[in-house]
Amino acid sequence: LSTEEMNELESYFPGKFQVTWPRDYEDYVYETEKLINLSGKKYHGKKNHINQFKAAYPDWSYETITDSNVEECFQMALKWRGANGCEEDPEKNQEMCVTLNSLRLFKELHLKGGLLRAGGKVVAFTLGEPVCDDTFVVHIEKAYADVRGAYPLINQQFLEHEVSGYKYVNREDDTGEEGLRTAKLSY
C-alpha cells in the first residue's frame, strides 16, 4: 500500500484505518555477489565459521538437490525436527510441515535447492525460487546446529552455484525470532 493509496483510503473513510509496520515480517534483501564473496571486515566472522567447517570436514561437498538426493534432505529434515523440539512448538511444527512438503513436491513447485555433505551425510540444505528476473528468494534453510559453519557455508555455496545469475537474494523475514534476526542482520 503506497502513501498515496493510504491517503486516498483515509479521505474516503476518515479515522477508520490504523497503519502499522510489523518489524517481524520485514524481508532481508541482499546483493547476491556480496554474500557469495564475503569480502571485507563485516564478513570476517562468517568466513571464520566457514573455514572451521572446512577444516573439521575436509571431505565436505556441495550438491544441487535433485531427484536422486532429495530424500536424504527429507530424512535430514526429520532428524532436525526431532532435535529442535518442533513437536512441542506449534509455529516450528507448521514450519516443518512446509519444509517437508516442499521437499516432497520439490519438482512440482519448481524449487531450486542445494545441500552440504560432511562425512558423506547431509548436514545442511536450502530451497528457494526466482521471484522475478533479478531476485531469488530463499524459503528454507536447515543445518544441524552442532555442525559449526554449516549455515554460512550452505548459504554461500547455494548462492554461488545456483543463484549467482540474480542481482538480489531475498532471505525472507525473521518472524521476530531473536536468533534468526541476529543471524540475518549479520549479513
Where are these regions (language model features)?
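Well-ordered, non-membrane alpha-helical segments in soluble/globular domains
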Residues: 1, 46, 96-99
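A short amphipathic beta-strand at an alpha->beta junction
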Residues: 1-7, 167-170
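Conserved active-site alpha-helix within GNAT-family acetyltransferase domains
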Residues: 6-21, 48, 175-187
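Alpha-helix C-terminal capping segments
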Residues: 13, 53, 103-106, 158-163
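Acyltransferase donor/substrate-recognition loop-hinge adjacent to the catalytic core
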Residues: 13-87
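Short, conserved active-site entrance elements at the starts or edges of catalytic domains
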Residues: 68-122
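Aromatic (often tryptophan-rich) hydrophobic motifs at membrane interfaces
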Residues: 111-187
